[in-house]
């Protein structure tokens, strides 16, 4: 059986925290900022954790990431 390969697109988008959770950045941060409030833009800068429902699926893609 060949080795499992890490999904490289996912590896660039998600980072594992010290407690084993996955950290991700927000969407809607590339353009069209004139339509967003300052509060929205400030909140979008912060990273957040992957939700429980998506965690198992993403973990399979990142099986080999430390």
Swiss-Prot record:
Composition bias type Basic residues, residue spans: 1-16
Biological process terms in GO annotation: translation
Region of interest: Disordered: 1-24
CC annotations in GO: cytosolic large ribosomal subunit
A molecular function (GO) term: structural constituent of ribosome
Keywords: Ribonucleoprotein, Ribosomal protein
Family affiliation: Belongs to the bacterial ribosomal protein bL35 family.
Name this protein carries in UniProt: Large ribosomal subunit protein bL35
Organism: Anoxybacillus flavithermus (strain DSM 21510 / WK1)
Lineage: Bacteria, Bacillati, Bacillota, Bacilli, Bacillales
Encoding gene, per UniProt annotation: rpmI
């Amino acid at each position: 059986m060949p080795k499992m390969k890490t999904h490289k697109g996912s590896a660039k988008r998600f980072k594992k925290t010290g407690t084993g959770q996955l950290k991700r950045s927000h969407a809607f941060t590339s353009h069209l900022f004139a339509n967003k409030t300052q509060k929205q833009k400030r909140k979008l800068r912060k990273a957040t954790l992957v939700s429980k429902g998506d965690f198992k699926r993403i973990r399979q893609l990142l099986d080999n990431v430390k």
